[in-house]
Amino acid sequence: IVAPNKLHYVYMEEWSQAYPTAKVWATKGLEKIFADSKVISSYTILDKTVTMSWQSEIDYLPFEGSAFIEESVFFHKKSRTLILTDLIENIELLEECSCWHRFLFKIGDNTYPNGHTPRDLRMTFLFNKEIARKCYQKIKSWEPVNVLFAHGNCFIGDAEEKLPQAFFWLE
């Protein structure tokens, strides 16, 4: 069970209860929250030094450089699929979306079909952009074909074209 960043951990206790023998992994920044948990008694903080049982199938990288958040990035080697959480959003503005939501997504610069790292998240890398650029170069070196992420339409089969567009701010 993986908490990929400090914004995506809310149901970790429920998943831990449902699967009590599962190993729990958490990204840096969740130590205090997990230490206060009455359910999650054992967990491992993901960092560059930790050994994971899935290493032969999945590569791991902590995407660093943000003043606010560190995100765990994964790459499934066999399918050449990059797995992100919030580093790219590609929100489709459906007719049901209110004008207010449309406005927020537009200024967030994270709408379909041109998904990007959201503008507010990009700003958190302002003072450590070189660190983020090194992380981006690493994920590009994996040569993903697909990119999965938590918010919006994923990039299936066209990662080579879409990834540089999404990370234009690090190109």
Where are these regions (language model features)?
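Catalytic core of the metallo-beta-lactamase
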Residues: 39-107, 134-141
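Short glycine/proline-enriched coil/turn segments at helix->beta-strand junctions
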Residues: 19-21, 77-79, 144
